[in-house]
Swiss-Prot record:
Belongs to the S1FA transcription factor family. The keyword Ligase does not apply. This is DNA-binding protein S1FA. Its main location: nucleus. One of its GO terms (biological process) is regulation of DNA-templated transcription.
């Protein structure tokens, strides 16, 4: 019991603070990663927004029809 108390007093308080903050940060990041992977597997994919007629015309011109003058 006495040996443990001597070792505990020898630890730098700054080191303890760094370890606590580092542990919390690591926990936060791991938790976020787990939530992200869970969401990717289980949530339905986002619905695409409807494309306007103007954009559809532009896409059609890009794909098939050559622009005038070429």
């Amino acid at each position: 019991m006495a040996v443990n108390e001597v070792e505990a007093k020898g630890l730098n308080p700054g080191l303890i603070v760094l370890l606590v903050i580092g542990g919390l940060l690591l926990t936060f990041l791991v938790g976020n990663f787990i939530l992200y992977t869970y969401a990717q597997k289980n949530l339905p994919p986002k619905k695409k927004k409807p494309i306007s007629k103007k954009k559809m015309k532009r896409e059609r011109l890009k794909q098939g029809v050559a622009p005038p003058g070429e």
